[in-house]
Amino acid sequence: MHALTTVENPSARLLPGVLALIRDVEAADGHEVLEAHRWIDLANADAESLHGIAVTLDDDTVVGYVHLRRHHRHGIELELLVAPDHRDEAASIVGALVEAASASLETLGPHEIFAWVPRHSRQVIDALEGLGFRADRAVRQLRRPLPLESDHPARPIDCPPFRTFRPGEDEDAWLEVNNRAFAWHPDQGDWDLETLLARERESWFDPAGFLLAEQDGRLVGFCWTKVHAPRSSSALGEIYVIATDPERAPRGLGSCLLVAGLDYLAHHDIPTASLYVEDTNERALRLYDRFGFVVDHEDVRLVWRLPAAS
């Protein structure tokens, strides 16, 4: 068992170690860690972002990291990372991270703390459950190879034309449809203009891959794509957000938008498409199953209530 030290808000001295940990976890687990909004928080010092806590060995090797983020609807969110070659010590590392996080949050009073565990890491989940957390949500990443076959049985025969998103013009209409379509969703349903503009400032943002459907001059649906590592052999396309207006969209528009997004990614030589979906969203899961998507991995959220300070 190694001696562990917790460091709040890691300084520039430890930042390379945090980044190395992230790269190691991504290489071991095969997908990106720290969701996009957490990276944006860190880059922009977002007011909703609290801070990060690292766990180090005596030689300053970073073996664990947690990013804390205040969510106005869901208490405090944590995302925990444990170094792949130290996961046999997950109980100790996670315990140190949660203890430090709890101490830093005591002044907030009783709060629910939500911990995201990427790729359903069994060691990390066991460690959290041992501390009293319980699983309450799971998000699946689905993937399928590209291109979608021209004669694929799920490909719609007749689809309307789509246009691309116009930055500076389409934000209000898009926010209205997005928030109405995702009113039920814990993360996607309450975006505001700054949330959208922060995405537009990201290096990956490309309005050419942000497709809009209109009917009688009104926005009724969209498919927003994203490309990870676009110039590498591991390039991965993502259907980042897709939705139709629940009040106005014609039947079948969702399938047409999905195909348009897949075709856009394939046209740019992306070999694989991915998307995220709640494991309880049976309607969406049935749609993606028809198009040949399969589960790549599952991210799990666990919850624990921070007690009142004594």
UniProtKB/Swiss-Prot annotation:
1D-myo-inositol 2-(L-cysteinylamino)-2-deoxy-alpha-D-glucopyranoside binds at residues 187, 226, 238, 276. The keyword Transferase applies. It catalyses: 1D-myo-inositol 2-(L-cysteinylamino)-2-deoxy-alpha-D-glucopyranoside + acetyl-CoA = mycothiol + CoA + H(+). Monomer. SUPFAM superfamilies: Acyl-CoA N-acyltransferases (Nat) (SSF55729). The lineage of its organism: Bacteria, Bacillati, Actinomycetota, Acidimicrobiia, Acidimicrobiales. It comes from Acidimicrobium ferrooxidans (strain DSM 10331 / JCM 15462 / NBRC 103882 / ICP). HAMAP family: MshD. Acetyl-CoA 2 binds at residues 242-244, 281-286. InterPro entries: Acyl_CoA_acyltransferase, GNAT_dom, MshD_Acetyltransferase, Mycothiol_AcTrfase. It comes from the Bacteria. PANTHER family: L-AMINO ACID N-ACETYLTRANSFERASE, MYCOTHIOL ACETYLTRANSFERASE. Residues 5-155, 160-309 form the N-acetyltransferase domain. GO terms for molecular function: mycothiol synthase activity; protein-N-terminal-alanine acetyltransferase activity. This is Mycothiol acetyltransferase. Belongs to the acetyltransferase family. MshD subfamily. GO terms for biological process: mycothiol biosynthetic process. Acetyl-CoA 1 binds at residues 80-82. Keywords: Acyltransferase, Repeat, Transferase. CDD domains: NAT_SF. Pfam families: Acetyltransf_1 (PF00583).
